[in-house]
Design a protein with these regions (language model features):
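A surface-exposed loop-and-adjacent beta-strand signature within N-terminal beta-sandwich domains
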Residues: 95-190
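Sterically constrained small-residue positions within well-ordered secondary structures
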Residues: 13, 286, 356-360
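Short linear interaction motif-like sites in intrinsically disordered regions of transcription factors
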Residues: 9-12, 55, 142, 275-278, ...
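Exposed beta-sheet edge/beta-hairpin loop segments within beta-rich domains
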Residues: 149-218, 228-238, 351-387, 398
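N-terminal small/polar-rich segments of proteins
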Residues: 22-133, 203-329, 366-389, 393-398
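Processing junctions and N-termini across compartments
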Residues: 16, 43, 53, 143, ...
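Gram-negative bacterial Sec-dependent N-terminal signal peptides
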Residues: 1-22
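Outer membrane beta-barrel transmembrane domains
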Residues: 313-362
């Protein structure tokens, strides 16, 4: 007997679309929900690292999507900074929306699952750098921040430009908020300055893939950019007005199966073996011929188990006498909590009663010949050998 195992991985692709006056960013992630991995696997953010040259803008090729990851948007926001006690004219002003829900829809079944998207960091590139002119301490650095952010040493400055990136306080990542630097010279008013990039950190709270069927899921999220919008960087003229996020998630569950050495061959025996049968009298017809094939299995979602037969017998298989071609029907049973007949049409099995992953589970297939008339015919061929190839296909694509 040969057991074919189909292994599958998971890709998450998040695409930022490009409508009119919209920023565009591509974010990709991969999900390998292997039950044999620690934690059963997670979505991995595989977005190519677009790290800036300045210290503190971070990337990780192995980070899961529930860890903060960066992105930046090239944009132009022309501003005039002035100290008039109006925060939207402050040296820095960064307002952001709270968590947003996205509906991921299976492209075949129409079944949907929730995905949550939220920001963890926010910042910008300002050019020219007017900090030294505006600040009382005569520095190029924007180390100070008030409101719903906190400084985390993620700044870089030169006379021509200043980059700043602040941590959003944990309680505001889901709720939204605003951050600002309004402590500068009371008489200061800039001629003009511009934000050339927006820096953002984000996390995804993905649906539980162990509860998702294989296939492609899609969803989208549109965020507005501008005054009193989802992303607001204060008074100014904005070159882009929205950010469209298109999500595509591919789910393919993995299977791992370990058969014992020699597991590609099984020998069917009567209860107690042939020696016992001979001892009790060869004229007696055995009640059955059977063999069990044990194996270890790891899988996290429903799988389909199908037979393929060298000698088909309807939805089951025959084995064949090598001398005279006598065909004998053999039954193949999947055994976990009960014996279930496996067929060429295939049957769907869950990893457990409650749906939790099967991890290194001990299972077995039982091969049986039980028909008394068939067994009687077989006993008329002493010394004969019956053979047949039965292929068991484990398929996670259901």
């Amino acid at each position: 007997m040969r057991a074919d195992v189909m292994h599958y991985g998971l890709w998450l692709v998040v695409l930022f679309g490009l409508p009119v006056q919209a920023a565009s960013i591509d974010v990709t992630a991969e999900y390998n929900p292997a039950a044999y991995e620690v934690g059963y696997g997670k979505f991995i953010n595989t977005t190519p690292c677009l790290s800036e040259s300045w210290s503190g803008f971070w990337c990780s090729d192995t980070s899961t999507v529930d860890q903060s990851q960066p992105l930046f948007i090239s944009i132009t926001i022309d501003r005039v900074v002035k100290n008039n006690n109006n925060l939207i004219d402050a040296l820095t002003y960064l307002a952001f929306v709270g968590a947003r829900d996205v509906s991921l829809v299976h492209q075949n079944s129409g079944k949907s699952y929730p995905l949550k998207f939220f920001f963890t960091k926010i910042g910008a590139l300002m050019s020219p750098n007017i900090a030294k002119e505006a600040l009382v301490n005569n520095t190029d650095w924007l180390d100070h921040i008030d409101g719903d952010c906190q400084h985390s040493l993620n700044t870089y400055a030169s006379p021509s430009q200043v980059h700043y990136l602040y941590d959003i306080k944990p309680e505001n990542q889901l709720a939204g908020g605003k951050c600002y630097h309004n402590k500068f010279k009371t008489t200061f008013s800039s001629k003009s300055t511009a934000l050339k990039k927006i820096y953002l950190g984000y996390k995804l709270k993905a649906p539980d893939p162990l509860k998702m069927e294989n296939g492609v899921y899609k969803g989208s999220l549109v965020l507005s950019i501008g005054r009193n919008k989802d992303l607001d960087f204060g008074n100014g003229t904005y070159s882009d007005s929205q950010l469209t996020i298109n999500f595509t998630m591919k789910v393919r569950h993995q299977i791992k199966i370990d058969f014992p050495p020699g597991g590609d061959k099984v020998v069917l025996l009567p209860p107690g073996g042939w020696s016992d049968w001979i001892y009790r009298g060869k004229n007696r017809v055995p009640s059955s011929l059977r063999a069990d094939l044990h194996y270890r299995i790891w899988f996290s979602s429903k799988i389909k188990v199908t037979l393929s037969c060298e000698y088909p017998n309807g939805s089951e298989c025959f084995i064949k006498n090598t001398k005279d071609g006598h065909l004998v029907p053999i039954h193949v049973y999947w055994r976990d909590y009960s014996l279930i007949t496996t067929t060429t049409a295939g049957l769907v099995f869950a990893p457990s009663v409650d749906g939790t992953p099967a991890v290194n589970a001990d299972r077995f297939f039982s091969f049986k010949i039980t028909d008394s008339q068939v067994l009687k015919e077989m006993m008329k061929r002493p010394g004969g050998t019956y053979k047949g190839k039965v292929t068991i296909i484990f398929d996670a694509t259901i």
